[in-house]
């Protein structure tokens, strides 16, 4: 992420703070996004994860990301940050 978006700030969110909040928040220029990282597309979602990903996607950009969709999600993130 730091190579794709020079100067961005990436924070790892504390799962104990708000249950279901996405794992990463990325701040880039005047934009932000969140990513919920999964080891695979089949990994089980925890309580509230879908709610927060959907809600934050309405506000800005948020996705579940895993090895199977990594390239697609990063391309979408790049488009969101450039729009």
Please name every model-derived segment.
Residues 1-83:
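Catalytic phosphate/metal-binding cores of nucleic-acid and nucleotide-processing enzymes, i.e., regions
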């Amino acid at each position: 992420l730091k190579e794709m978006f020079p100067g961005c700030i990436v924070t790892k969110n504390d799962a104990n703070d708000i249950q279901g909040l996405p794992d990463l928040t990325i701040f880039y220029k005047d934009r932000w996004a969140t990513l919920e990282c999964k080891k695979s597309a089949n990994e089980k979602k925890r309580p509230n994860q879908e709610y927060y990903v959907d809600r934050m996607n309405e506000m800005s950009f948020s996705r579940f990301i895993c090895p199977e969709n990594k390239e697609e999600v990063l391309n979408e993130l790049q488009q969101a940050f450039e729009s």
